[in-house]
């Protein structure tokens, strides 16, 4: 499943890594739910498992809060937790840039603040700017060669993602998840998103 503004779901000529004008984090979560409903209709006897990785892990966590009891199990891969001050600062910066350049503008500053520190764990001279994505260099090279990967995220997407992180981390929201659904939380031991396996 491609998220809105990503992969093959991106209309020709559209801005990549941008959910779309007026689209919110909740719009993307509702899109996941629409796919879920279609799968339930097409395969009513099969269990449905939700798996999300990286940004998809954050969207999946929002989904589990907003639509408890709709999936049979979930796998949350490469997820993390951000301090409120980090979220607040990111929202202020991305909001300021969006007011000047528009929400569909990409920002090297915001991208570097969001992902730049991830590569620092891999030495002073990483092989690529994306070494943090995988311990397997072939995976990193395939990612960098794929025209559907690696576009700079827009400030509009960053704002929505930060709002999603804040929503996910709100204790009252966490309590809304289905406590009987099996959920596997998993992260690589060198994954900076998951604090090097610490979560």
Where are these regions (language model features)?
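Alpha/beta-hydrolase-fold enzymes
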Residues: 60-148
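Conserved alpha/beta-hydrolase
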Residues: 1-13
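Alpha/beta-hydrolase active-site loop
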Residues: 20-40
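Short beta-strand/loop motif that positions the catalytic acidic residue
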Residues: 185-187
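Glycine-rich nucleophile elbow surrounding the catalytic serine of serine-hydrolase chemistry
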Residues: 52-62
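Alpha/beta-hydrolase fold nucleophile elbow
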Residues: 43-54
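Acidic catalytic loop of the alpha/beta-hydrolase fold
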Residues: 150, 189-199
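Active-site nucleophile elbow and catalytic-triad environment of alpha/beta-hydrolase enzymes
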Residues: 153-175
